[in-house]
Amino acid sequence: MRICFIMYPWKTVDPLYDSTLRVIHECIRRGHTVAIGTSSNLTIRGSITQAYVDVFVKQAKISNNFKVFYKTAKFKRCQLPLSGFDAIFMREDPPLNNIALNFLDSVKDDAFIINDINGLRVANNKLYTASFNDEQNSFIPVTHASKNREYLEKVLRECKHDKMILKPLNGHGGSGVIVVEKKAISSFRSLLDFYISGEKQDYVILQEYVEGAEQGDVRILMLNGVPIGAMKRIPAEGELRANVSTGGSVAKHTLTKEEKALCQFIGPKLVNDGLFFVGIDVINGKLIEV
C-alpha cells in the first residue's frame, strides 16, 4: 500500500514517545510505501490536489529501536497527487486547519482517510464530548463551555465541590489546564483575563474536577469503536497534567470494568462519526477528552 501521513514537522518528533512515529515504523516494517508531509505543503495544480512529501527510502534493515529508526531515516522529496495514495493519516495536532480539511475533501473518494474528514471536523475541539448525550453524567464529567465571564464565575461559585478544571477549548497536550478553587475567585478572574480577553476572546472549558486526577489518567486507544490497548499516564511530582510532554511517565494498564463500560458507551458513535482510530483520555472511568 501507499500511505501518506499529514503530520507535524519531522524535526519536531520525539522518537522516545511519539505515537505517529510508531505507526509509521509499523507500516514500513510491513513493507508499505510511506510518505510524510505537513498541511502547509498541500497544493492544487490543474484542479488536482497534490502535496510536497518526503517518501521514506526503503532500507535493507529496519531498526526496532525507535531512536535509531528516526535518526537513520532517509527520504526522497516528491510532489505527488494525494489521489495516488491508498490511505491518508491525518495526524496533525488539534485544532486542525479547516483549509487543510478542504484540500482532503477533494480526494475523499480516492483514498481512505483516517479519520473521516467530517469526523475530524465534528471532533476538532473539546466540545465533542458533549455530543454523547450523557445526561446523567455517568461517563462524562459535568462540563461548561463559554466565554461569558459572568456565567463562568457563577458556575464556579455554585459548584458542589471546592475546585474545578479550567482549560482552553482548542488546547492540546495538556497546555493551559489549570485547577481553579472556589475560594479564589479573584485569581479565577485573572485567569479569565488571560484566556478570554483581547481580540481573540477564546472559549474556555470549565469542568467538574474528577477525583483521582492528581494520580494521572488513562490513555485508551480505540480502533473501530473497540479498545485495543491502554496505558496509565502518571504526572510528574507537583504537576496535575499527566501528558508525557509535561514530564509525565507511563505504565502498562489493564482496563477496569468502568473503563470498559465507557468504551462500549462511546464506541458506536465514534464509528458512526468516522472516528476509526482515536485515543481517549479517561480519569476514574470518566471521559475527559477524545
Where are the predicted features?
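Phosphate-binding site of ATP-dependent enzymes
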Residues: 19-20, 149-150, 157-162, 170-262, ...
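Structural detector of well-ordered beta-strand residues that form the stable sheet scaffold
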Residues: 35, 113-115, 165, 205-207, ...
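Short glycine-enriched loops at secondary-structure junctions
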Residues: 94, 118-122, 233-236, 283-285
